[in-house]
């Protein structure tokens, strides 16, 4: 959905959705490559929790906090800093080389030309693969309900045949995004997630709230990159370019890293995740696919790592010692079985 054409020193971004109605949040830890955007971060949390009804593990990172940027803020930033950027609310039907340019045709049969194509369209679904899917609501509640200095990264709840957790971003003492997230092969109706959110809020004595907005999404928990193009002027980016880290679902910050690396590369692709990170992700995801998991493995993992180590794991920057701690945290026999498959 992102196509760049610099033939006339312009950038055109094609987006099939009405982006004026969109206002979701991008979450990430503050890595070095995200620091150039620090001034548009909505909020930072230096503490987060991972747990269930019996146990909470609290992590702290003073130099690499968890951050969010809203889509509206990001769009405004892009439009203000890139004077030659135009966003076109159309879907691209096809594009193909024509002489020294690419000919781009949209659903209304309009034609555009570009020297380079940056393609971030959704990848093909793979049956039987795990998905991370979620639905969240932004709510306003009574004063002093939330601890705005600590986010709930994962609060696991018991659900039949799926891994489920609640994720909460407290923007203030009375405003928060509360999200229901599932790891499974099938996506559910919005009412399923709403019920889990309501149940969680009631268990925490939040019986009255005002819903301001909602958001939902689906992220593949498999390596979903498309085959690299033989044309050096076609760049697959985002999930279709292998930017997403499947085991964690983080994509936005890795897309930024991907673009930064492509700018300095002479090739039309870059490897965002190294061989060992990809191997560990594959083993971890296969473990989740083939074993009943209720979140206890995640809690054990969190208990064996400090905040900076956990952050490095989630953002694909863990060193060898942290990787060994991660492996040691996993159930030994099932994990070893997946390792040698």
Regions found by a protein language model. Name each.
Residues 9-10, 175, 233:
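Residues at the starts of beta-strands that form the adenosine-phosphate
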Residues 260-341:
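C-terminal helical "tail/cap" subdomain of flavin- and related membrane-associated enzymes
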């Amino acid at each position: 959905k992102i196509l760049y054409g610099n033939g006339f020193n312009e950038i055109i971004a094609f987006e099939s959705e009405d982006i004026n109605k969109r206002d979701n949040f991008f979450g990430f830890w503050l890595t070095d490559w995200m620091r150039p955007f620090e001034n548009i971060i909505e909020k930072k949390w230096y503490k987060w929790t991972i747990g269930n009804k019996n146990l909470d593990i609290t992590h702290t990172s003073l130099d690499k906090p968890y951050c969010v940027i809203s889509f509206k803020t990001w769009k405004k930033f892009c439009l203000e800093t890139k004077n030659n950027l135009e966003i076109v609310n159309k879907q691209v039907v096809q594009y193909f080389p024509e002489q020294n340019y690419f000919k781009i045709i949209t659903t209304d049969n309009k034609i555009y030309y570009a020297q380079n194509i940056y393609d971030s369209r959704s990848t093909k679904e793979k049956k039987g693969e795990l998905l991370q899917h979620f639905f969240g609501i932004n709510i306003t509640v009574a004063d002093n309900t939330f601890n705005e200095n600590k986010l709930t990264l994962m609060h696991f709840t018991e659900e039949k045949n799926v891994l489920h957790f609640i994720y909460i971003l407290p923007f203030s003492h009375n405003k928060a995004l509360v999200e229901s997230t599932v790891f499974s092969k099938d996506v559910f109706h919005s009412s399923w997630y709403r019920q889990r959110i309501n149940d969680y809020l009631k268990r925490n004595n939040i019986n009255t709230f005002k819903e301001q907005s909602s958001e939902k999404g689906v992220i593949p928990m498999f390596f979903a990159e498309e085959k690299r193009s033989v044309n050096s002027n076609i760049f697959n980016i985002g999930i279709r370019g292998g930017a997403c880290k499947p085991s964690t679902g983080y994509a936005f910050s890795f897309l930024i890293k991907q673009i930064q690396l492509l700018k300095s590369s002479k090739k039309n692709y870059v490897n965002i995740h190294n061989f060992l990170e990809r191997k560990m992700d594959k083993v971890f995801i296969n473990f989740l696919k083939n074993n009943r998991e209720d979140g206890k493995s995640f809690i054990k993992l969190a208990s064996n790592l400090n905040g900076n180590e956990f952050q490095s794991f989630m953002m694909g920057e863990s060193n060898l010692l942290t990787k060994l701690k991660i492996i040691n945290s996993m159930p030994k026999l099932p994990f070893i079985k997946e390792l040698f498959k």
